[in-house]
């Protein structure tokens, strides 16, 4: 199980069933008891999770694709005209990754009472998004980073 968590966290998806297993994990409440139960899965348990997660994963990607299609627009972030979408933080990784294809990077944002949060994603061919995030006081990794701006910032008003 831990290998699948790492596989998704590092956005490698090299282990068979990672997306499906993680879909099952994400469908449960985040409690220590539930995590203990999920982490104790043996090989048969992982196979069952893979089967159960296939439909969840299919629905997730269908929803992400449809939302990106209707929500995507362009915005200048860090001097780069890139695709963006206003989506819940739970969809940021998959949605921004999809929009980043053929682009320097892509962003998803979600508003809170305090300001606007941005999640940036880039493909291997894209820019180092941690450098972009640092311009706004954020940080992260080369291909996944983020930052937050206050409600009166120009990026929060467009």
Model regions and ranges:
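Internal, active-site/partner-interface "lid" segment
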Residues: 1-48
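A short, terminal or domain-edge coil/loop segment
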Residues: 20-27, 55-62, 126
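Short N-terminal helix-initiation segments at or just after the protein's N-terminus
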Residues: 22-25, 47-56, 87-92
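Electropositive nucleic-acid-contacting surfaces
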Residues: 32-78
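Gly/His-enriched, cation/cofactor- and phosphate-binding structural elements
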Residues: 61-158
């Amino acid at each position: 199980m831990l290998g699948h968590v790492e596989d998704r966290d590092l956005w490698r998806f090299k282990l068979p069933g990672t997306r499906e297993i993680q879909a099952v994990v994400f469908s449960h409440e985040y409690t220590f008891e539930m995590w203990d139960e999920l982490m104790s899965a043996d090989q048969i348990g992982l196979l069952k999770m893979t089967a159960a997660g296939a439909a969840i994963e299919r629905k997730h990607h269908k929803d992400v694709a449809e939302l990106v299609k209707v929500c995507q627009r362009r915005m200048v972030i860090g001097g780069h005209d890139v695709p963006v979408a206003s989506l819940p933080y739970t969809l940021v990784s998959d949605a921004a990754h999809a929009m980043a294809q053929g682009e320097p990077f892509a962003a998803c944002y979600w508003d809170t009472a305090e300001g606007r949060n941005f999640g940036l994603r880039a493909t291997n061919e894209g820019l180092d998004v941690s450098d972009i995030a640092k311009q706004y006081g954020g940080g992260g990794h080369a291909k996944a980073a983020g930052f937050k701006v206050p409600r009166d910032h120009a990026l929060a008003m467009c």
